[in-house]
A protein has these predicted regions:
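Extracellular/periplasmic helix-loop-helix junctions in multi-pass membrane proteins
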Residues: 291-298, 309-332
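Membrane-water interface regions at transmembrane-helix termini and the short interhelical loops
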Residues: 30, 102, 118-140, 199-202, ...
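Small-residue-rich segments of transmembrane alpha-helices in multi-pass membrane proteins
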Residues: 72-83, 139-155, 216-223, 304, ...
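Hydrophobic, membrane-embedded alpha-helices of multi-pass small-molecule transporters
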Residues: 5-24, 39-43, 47-50, 82-86, ...
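Membrane-interface interhelical connector segments
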Residues: 231-260
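Membrane-interface loop-to-helix entry segments
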Residues: 112-113, 125-155, 323-339
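Hydrophobic alpha-helical segments and their helix-loop junctions in multi-pass secondary transporters
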Residues: 4, 87-90, 94, 126, ...
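Membrane helical hairpin/interfacial module
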Residues: 21-111
Length: 347
């Protein structure tokens, strides 16, 4: 049976939100400078309050679709806007992974080639049942967490924490406020876990384990931002497409063993893949009464994602400007939209 425990749900939270800010951290560091990690802490606190409010409301009805539809026509409109956010995440996942692989590993391989391999593999997984996806999420997220811990330990000796000083020089500038807004938008991807609440076998411990997952996620991202700035400095880390890859290249043991890229590529491929699966499968869950043929839907959906992803990744500078726009879109579709709907539903 398709059942989910609250402990398992914690892995869905991690899988949906752990990778984005870490992957293209230069987008945020370019705006927030050496204080980006502190700005992230503010973003995390704001988002935590909203997301936990969502979970408390969902405890009365675990089916998020029913919550939206209870608002009649207005609720249907909000549901479609909310679902569009899942499509945005699918595009973000496919394009960022393909761009990262192309830029860091296979420069001579075109991005469309990477996209095809990614979408074929994801299409195969999406055609499976929920239990298969659950197992994949649990194994992948757990393995990635272990890899992140090992990578952070290995990179510790290369960090120069003087790059983090002075703290909050110049106060809160316009760019820093923009960085906070964009990071809240990025964290909004955590909301793709909400459609999976309907699979919970029990509500017991939902807030507890979800809070633990969010705390782990925030600590890892917070540590990643600190290590990136301490390793490269605020100026350089804000002007490199994928700073974590540069960090991983520096790892060396006994002047002989170099394997940091292995951690990076494993984490990047696995977590973006999981995020894409969670977002795409959420759409299938929400509209399973409309989707009569799952295979045809996956083919059409993957084709649309391919076209949009290929278009926005034609140029890296162009793509990283698109990423800022995508964060704002996620903020509107995945945070503000359900916040509006849940507020009306609750009152």
């Amino acid at each position: 049976m398709d059942k989910l425990s609250t402990k398992h749900f914690a892995f869905f939270i991690l899988g949906s939100s752990l990778i984005a800010i870490k992957s293209y951290s230069s987008v945020f560091i370019n705006l927030g400078g050496r204080d980006t990690y502190l700005l992230f802490a503010i973003s995390a606190l704001i988002f935590s309050f909203v997301f936990l409010s969502f979970l408390k409301i969902c405890k009365s009805n675990l089916d998020i679709k029913e919550i939206f539809l209870s608002l009649n026509l207005f609720g249907k409109i909000l549901l479609y806007i909310f679902t569009f956010g899942f499509f945005i995440i699918s595009v973000e996942s496919a394009s960022t992974l393909s761009s990262s692989i192309h830029s860091n590993f296979f420069l001579s391989t075109p991005i469309w080639y990477c996209l095809i391999f990614f979408l074929i593999a994801s299409g195969y997984v999406l055609n499976k049942n929920f239990n298969s996806i659950l197992i994949l999420v649990l194994i992948t997220v757990f393995s990635t967490l272990i890899g992140d811990i090992i990578l952070f330990i290995l990179i510790g000796k290369y960090l120069n924490f003087s790059h983090l000083l002075p703290i909050m020089k110049g106060g809160f500038t316009t760019n820093k406020w923009i960085a906070i807004i964009l990071m809240i938008g990025s964290l909004s991807s955590m909301c793709i876990s909400l459609p999976y609440l309907k699979f919970l076998s029990s509500k017991k411990g939902l807030i507890k384990y979800s809070s633990m997952a969010m705390t782990i996620c925030f600590i890892i991202i917070f540590s990643s931002l600190i290590s990136t700035i301490a390793f490269l400095g605020p100026i350089r880390s804000g002007n490199i497409f994928y700073p974590e890859f540069v960090q991983s290249q520096r790892i060396q043991i006994a002047n002989f063993l170099e394997f940091g890229e292995l951690f990076y590529i494993f984490k990047t491929v696995c977590m973006w893949f999981i995020k894409y699966i969670l977002a795409s499968y959420s759409i299938i869950l929400l509209f399973k009464d409309i989707i009569t043929n799952k295979k045809i839907f996956i083919i059409i959906y993957s084709s649309i994602v391919f076209i949009v992803s290929w278009y926005i990744t034609q140029n890296q500078y162009y793509f990283f400007q698109w990423l800022k726009i995508l964060q704002l879109c996620l903020l509107i579709t995945l945070l503000i939209t359900p916040l509006l709907g849940f507020t009306i539903y609750n009152f």
